[in-house]
């Protein structure tokens, strides 16, 4: 755990699973993610994610009719000072199509996340999905590799 050190290259992009792990406090990822969020808050850094993360993160609480968990997701998504939602634009979709065409293991939502990160110029992409390693231009970091602080 913690094979990297801060500061990570800015800007940082997070996949939907990172937001879900954070809000649902999923172990064994939570210790490293707690340190990550402390670091971004202390540095005043903006963390990027796609608006697609709204859909991906709210399905579980809505399906379970868990209003408390839904409210926690909405708070982080819409009220966090250092989380920026990037729109799913036409240029993102065009780039996602290219990624899907050349990386068959990449599913459509993942291609949208990768394209969003690339279009936004994200230097670091934090995810727990190994298939992102196949995307050229992304420096992929797993939660287990984040430094704990």
Indicate where each model-derived feature is located:
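Conserved glycosyltransferase catalytic-site signature
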Residues: 16, 51, 109-114
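Short, flexible helix/strand-to-coil boundary loops that buttress conserved ligand/catalytic motifs
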Residues: 23, 61, 100, 136-139
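Short, well-structured N-terminal submotif of metal-dependent ribonuclease cores
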Residues: 1-49, 62-75, 130, 147-149
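Short active-site oxyanion
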Residues: 42-47, 82-84, 121-124
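Acidic, PIN/NYN-like endoribonuclease modules and their adjacent C-terminal/linker elements
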Residues: 1-7, 11, 114-149
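Acidic catalytic patch
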Residues: 25, 52-53, 80-103
